[in-house]
A protein has these predicted regions:
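Short, acidic/polar
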Residues: 28-35, 113-123, 168-171
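Extended amphipathic secondary-structure runs
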Residues: 116-152
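Phosphate-binding glycine-rich loops and adjacent basic patches that engage nucleotide phosphates
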Residues: 19-23, 109-114, 134-136
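Glycine-rich phosphate-binding active-site loops on the catalytic face of alpha/beta enzymes
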Residues: 1-8, 31-32, 38-55, 133-141, ...
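Glycine-enriched alpha-helix->loop->beta-strand junction motifs that scaffold or abut catalytic
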Residues: 34-43, 62-68, 126-131, 150-157, ...
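Alpha-helix-loop-beta-strand connector modules within alpha/beta enzyme cores
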Residues: 6-26, 55-74, 140-169, 202-212
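Short, glycine/charged-enriched secondary-structure capping and boundary segments
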Residues: 58-59, 83-86, 147-149, 173-176, ...
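Conserved anion-binding
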Residues: 38-130, 202-212
Length: 212
């Protein structure tokens, strides 16, 4: 890995925030409402929105879109293969379940939901969610390409945080994946030379100081 970029070398200002306090409140919909009613300016909603497709729209109507975001833990979607005998009667070919690498959303217990992350985020944005906190472990170029596709589509509406990785290559997230907003555990926030450089660079976009 190259040496951390100096602030002057950063082509795009990047927001850096602590992950603590950005995760969804406990207690399901009641906990979300209690947090908003207590004055939280912004709440990220996770599995509750995945299980209830109407929840985001309902909360946006009651509290305003600027206060509702998405929490989206993801992992690379597994590919299964099946025999295609319909498209050409003379040939039998194996076809994959997904045509290109993509992320699927994980449930709160870490199991796979089978829900295509990019599709779901787009649907929730359409219903009024303002941004998304994506937790992912970027393991290879395929993950970087997925990230780049998402950031090209939604830009600084996306916060990116590590899922399980304790020492992620944040420089690649920014330079190759296009990440414009990073949310990291406190230890990484305090000790990463690269993040120190990012925090000293000019920042664009909305502040996250009051995100609940």
């Amino acid at each position: 890995m190259n040496a951390p970029a100096e602030p002057a070398e950063l082509s795009t200002p990047v927001a850096v925030r602590r992950l603590d306090g950005m995760l969804p409140p406990e207690g399901g919909e009641a906990g979300i409402r209690a947090t908003l009613d207590a004055g939280a300016q912004h709440v990220f909603i996770g599995e509750d929105a995945l299980l209830d497709g109407a929840l985001v729209e309902k909360l946006v109507t009651e509290y305003g879109s600027g206060r509702i975001g998405l929490h989206v833990p993801v992992r690379r979607m597994q590919v299964s293969w099946s025999m295609d005998i319909d498209s050409n009667a003379d040939f039998r070919v194996m076809t994959p379940s997904v045509c290109e690498p993509c992320w699927e959303i994980l449930r709160a217990d870490g199991t796979r939901s089978g829900t295509h992350a990019a599709w779901w985020i787009g649907e929730m944005f359409r219903l009024g969610a303002t941004d998304a906190l994506i937790q992912a472990d970027i393991e290879d170029d395929a993950d970087l390409n997925i990230l780049a596709g998402l950031t090209e589509r939604w830009g600084d509406r996306l916060w990116l945080a590590p899922l399980n990785e304790t020492n992620p290559d944040l420089e690649s997230w920014v330079n190759l994946g296009g990440a414009a907003r990073l949310a990291v555990p406190d230890a990484l926030y305090q000790n990463s030379p690269y993040l120190t450089a990012l925090r000293s660079a000019p920042e664009t976009g909305a502040s996250n100081e009051d995100i609940g």
